[in-house]
């Protein structure tokens, strides 16, 4: 078999989001290895308890080895393979702090502050403190944490509905949005308003003790020091709304109060500049447009090089089998 054919079989035996994870693994593992070999990190405050670079490198390597073993040896573990993209996204996310520091792109925090002031004539997160109230603080905090649930929950509902097309389009669109956002974090490091201009606020945000604690716990993740641009919270919230409107309309209406609260809450909670949100929305529309197109192209390439598409219970040998009448269901 020619080398190009073997390479094509190897690449297109994977799903697109799996290849993306492996591509991210290389610079991430290199950065973690270099950071682990360097002098010990000195992190202040709650972040001092953050696991060291070596421990996180071993975790990342272990997840990657498990994934390769899963693809090779356990094709019947279909659900495990379906959730692995989110495992990779989470694993890469918690290591981005080292990647940002290692590649040391210029910090654009001051530029974001200036752009916000030029757009509005004032700094929006400072202006929003006039609305501070314990109820709003708790509500926006809950919405903010739901970032970790909105996209995956939509995917799970589509999975249980056994709608293969909608599930694949949703999963790939969300993962694309996340990885593009990760690139933004590394290329344009920026701090959140709460860290960049703490002296500008005259009103402290307080709600219930438990939710106050969860907000304070964010300081234990070093990425929050430089992971503001673009706003992936807002990007994924809007993307989940758009995907739900297209694929699961009733869930769109369920999400509306929480997704809206999340977007508004990033300003109220001083987590993002408005420019971060605009940049996140650009990612949203791009991922929403690209996800289905990349999935369909990948299916064609998989049929061409691998001879079939066998993903999470789906097994087809022709494109006619792959997308009958424009819709694809779970294989039996």
Language-model segments: residues:
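Interfacial helix-loop-helix junctions of multi-pass membrane proteins
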Residues: 40-41, 192-196, 228, 261-287
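Membrane-interfacial catalytic/cofactor-binding modules of polytopic membrane enzymes
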Residues: 183-249
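Interfacial segments of alpha-helical transmembrane regions
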Residues: 79-87, 152-188, 196
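Aromatic-anchored segments of alpha-helical transmembrane domains
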Residues: 26-35, 89-95, 178-186, 259-268
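Membrane-interface loop-to-helix entry segments
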Residues: 51-55, 136-150, 223-243, 278
């Amino acid at each position: 078999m020619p080398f190009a054919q073997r390479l094509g079989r190897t690449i297109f035996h994977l799903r697109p989001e799996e290849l993306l994870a492996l591509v991210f693994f290389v610079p991430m593992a290199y950065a973690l290895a270099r950071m682990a070999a360097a002098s010990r990190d000195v992190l202040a405050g709650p972040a001092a308890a953050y696991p060291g670079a070596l421990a996180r490198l071993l975790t990342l390597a272990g997840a990657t080895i498990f994934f390769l073993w899963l693809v090779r040896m356990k094709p019947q573990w279909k659900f495990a393979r379906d959730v692995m993209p989110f495992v990779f996204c989470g694993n890469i996310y918690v290591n981005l702090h080292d990647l940002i520091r290692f590649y040391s792109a210029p910090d654009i925090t001051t530029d974001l502050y200036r752009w916000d002031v030029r757009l509005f004539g004032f700094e929006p997160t400072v202006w929003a403190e006039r609305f501070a109230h314990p109820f709003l603080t708790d509500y926006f905090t809950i919405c903010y944490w739901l970032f970790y649930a909105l996209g995956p929950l939509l995917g799970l509902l589509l999975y249980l509905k056994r709608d293969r097309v909608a599930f694949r389009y949703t999963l790939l669109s969300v993962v694309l949005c996340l990885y593009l956002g990760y690139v933004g974090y590394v290329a344009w490091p920026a701090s959140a308003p709460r860290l960049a201009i703490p002296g500008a606020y005259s009103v402290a945000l307080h709600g219930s003790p438990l939710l106050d604690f969860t907000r304070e716990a964010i300081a234990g993740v070093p990425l929050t020091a430089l992971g503001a641009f673009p706003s992936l919270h807002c990007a994924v919230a809007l993307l989940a709304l758009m995907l739900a409107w297209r694929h699961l309309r009733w869930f769109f209406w369920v999400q509306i109060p929480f997704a809206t609260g999340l977007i508004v809450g990033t300003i109220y909670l001083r987590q993002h500049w408005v420019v971060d949100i605009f940049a996140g929305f650009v990612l949203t529309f791009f991922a929403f447009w690209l996800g289905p197109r990349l999935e369909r192209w990948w299916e064609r390439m998989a049929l061409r090089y691998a001879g079939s598409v066998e993903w999470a219970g789906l097994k087809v040998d022709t494109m006619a089998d792959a997308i009958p009448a424009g819709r694809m269901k779970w294989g039996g």
